[in-house]
């Protein structure tokens, strides 16, 4: 499951089909060309923002033009197919060998792509990657075999997020709670949810998902927060049919039925929770920091009323994110050109995604604690943070509880075959939230059995 900003509708068009004619020279495929006359290189790069995201699209077009002006021997062909990584078609496209020269991936795709043999090992060009030593090692290792540094590298991370607790600062104040100190344990979430629900008027203290894959996603996040794992270390078996998995279900059952702090409307999905938060009727829910800007933009909720706290619990938090990998058909020149463009667009403070002054001038939100790809304390992290705060258009203080806890949180990636597993998890979450006395052990064991089948067939 992805953060709010990635939930775009699928578009059937294949962008810039006519650009294939540019590939007449050289040996590279996938819409780009290898080194042509006078050393000219053409590369096709995935995930150009769609036209519906006008500001982001404009920034991309500006950056491509600036990059090509600075590098006249490189032509960028942008692919705006969206979603950038459609789970329903990604594997088939990968198997066909028709990926872009520089193709977009979620973190959860990396292992499968490497195993498929469809991506190029770029380790020999690692010295050309800007600020590689300042990137969080755990993020870089996601693009290595086995997730550890072993002399190979198949991709470059560009952004990441970890889940936390989105909360309504205004309701906290009304309930006599400190809006600068959101709960940090599930026991505190439960206690605060009761106080917020007691305000009446249809206000819900805490809400959770249970439909369209979102329920299984949040079950995973809440399991991680308690120190649990969805799958065994080898990724072959379910690992949540235990006391930790049971604790997730019991906690929700108690808040829903004993405390009555989760409201009666259930089977919630995607935008339901941001909408409830935006209407001032919800106190807390698990979500990434970008939910705050989405709630403000979509539902006109004042930024002053919104905050982000850490994921409750001491176990950890769910990590998501994305990056780029390189087609196995790329020539060395295409790989190096691709790295140079990714450096420009995603890995240089003050440029591309880190051009906060431009974003501010365009009326875009600046100040979110994501992406957070740099190692804490590094000079790159410090300069990026300083520039972001200088250009902030949202109250960065409202994210301080999240930021202060982040260095001590263990971030865990989603399980393999995540979407299929999440769909089965919906049934468990729905049962707990719609039935007063379901058989929790039976629900958990059935979910584990279904997960084992998914992993075995993956």
Regions found by a protein language model. Name each.
Residues 123-138, 182-184, 205-210, 228-248, ...:
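Short, solvent-exposed loop/beta-turn-alpha elements that line the ligand-binding surface or hinge
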Residues 173, 179, 394-458:
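Conserved C-terminal helix/tail region of periplasmic/extracytoplasmic solute-binding proteins
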Residues 295-301, 314-319, 325-423:
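C-terminal lobe and pocket-closing loops
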Residues 112, 218-221, 250-344:
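Extracytoplasmic/periplasmic substrate-binding proteins
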Residues 145-158, 163, 173, 187-238, ...:
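Extracytoplasmic/periplasmic solute-binding protein
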Residues 107-162, 218, 305-307:
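Hinge/lid segment of periplasmic solute-binding proteins
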Residues 192-194, 234-266:
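Glycine-centered hinge/linker elements that transmit conformational signals in sensory
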Residues 2-116, 427, 436-458:
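Conserved N-terminal structural module of periplasmic/extracytoplasmic solute-binding proteins
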């Amino acid at each position: 499951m992805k953060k709010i900003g990635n939930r775009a509708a699928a578009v059937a068009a294949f962008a810039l089909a006519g650009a294939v004619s540019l590939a007449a020279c050289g040996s590279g495929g996938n819409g780009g060309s290898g080194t042509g006359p006078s050393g000219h290189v053409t590369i096709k790069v995935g995930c150009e923002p769609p036209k519906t995201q006008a500001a982001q699209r404009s920034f991309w077009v500006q950056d491509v033009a600036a990059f090509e002006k600075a590098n006249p021997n490189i032509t960028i062909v942008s692919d705006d197919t969206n979603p950038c990584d459609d789970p329903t078609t990604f594997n088939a496209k990968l198997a066909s060998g028709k990926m872009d020269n520089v193709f977009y991936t979620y973190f959860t795709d990396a292992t499968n792509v490497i195993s498929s043999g469809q991506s190029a090992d770029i380790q020999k060009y690692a010295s050309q990657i800007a600020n590689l030593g300042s990137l969080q090692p755990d993020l870089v290792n996601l693009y290595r075999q086995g997730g550890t540094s072993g002399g190979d590298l198949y991709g470059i991370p560009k952004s990441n997020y970890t889940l936390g607790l989105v909360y309504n600062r205004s309701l906290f104040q009304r309930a006599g709670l400190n809006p600068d100190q959101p709960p940090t344990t599930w026991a505190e979430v439960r206690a605060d949810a009761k106080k917020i629900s007691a305000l009446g008027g249809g206000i819900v203290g805490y809400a959770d998902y249970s439909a369209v894959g979102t329920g299984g996603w949040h079950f995973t996040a809440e399991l991680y927060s308690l120190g649990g794992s969805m799958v065994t270390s080898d990724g072959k078996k379910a690992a949540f049919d235990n006391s930790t998995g049971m604790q997730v279900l019991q906690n929700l059952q108690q808040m829903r039925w004993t405390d009555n702090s989760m409201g009666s409307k259930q089977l919630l999905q995607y935008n339901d929770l941001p909408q409830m938060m935006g209407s001032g009727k919800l106190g807390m829910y698990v979500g990434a920091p970008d939910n705050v800007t989405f709630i403000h933009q979509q539902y006109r909720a004042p930024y002053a009323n919104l905050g982000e706290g850490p994921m409750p619990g001491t176990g950890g938090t769910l990590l998501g994110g994305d990056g780029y990998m390189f087609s196995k058909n790329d020539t060395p020149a295409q790989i190096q050109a691709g790295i140079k463009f990714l450096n420009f667009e995603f890995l240089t403070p003050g440029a591309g995604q880190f051009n906060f002054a431009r974003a501010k001038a365009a009326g875009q939100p600046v100040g979110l604690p994501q992406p957070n790809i740099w190692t804490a304390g590094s000079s790159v992290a410090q300069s990026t943070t300083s520039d972001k705060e200088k250009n902030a258009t949202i109250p960065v203080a409202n994210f301080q509880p999240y930021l202060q806890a982040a260095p001590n949180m263990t971030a865990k990636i989603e399980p393999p075959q995540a979407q299929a597993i999440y769909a089965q998890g919906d049934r468990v979450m729905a049962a707990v939230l719609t039935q007063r006395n379901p058989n929790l052990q039976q629900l958990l064991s059935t979910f584990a059995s279904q997960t084992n089948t998914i992993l075995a067939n993956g």
